[in-house]
């Protein structure tokens, strides 16, 4: 953010929040993109975003359980999303996701 150091914290937070809302909208529209592929290639998925939303809420004293956070991210109940849009994972997808989870742990210094 070297070139943008003149942006105050409140404005930066508003910009980041708007970008996050746009990401959620995009993911809700792209139901063809499976969570396992997001996780395998990008190291995160809609469930990760849900966990991060719940963690951020808790850090600010807001009670938000896992199901509510998932509904926030998915735009519908998680079970409804899975039944409408989730397809069975292939062995290749599972292997890629497992490797990505291991990479996440290594990057965070957990393994």
Where are these regions (language model features)?
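Domain-level signature for proteins that mediate thiol-based redox and metal-cofactor handling
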Residues: 2-111
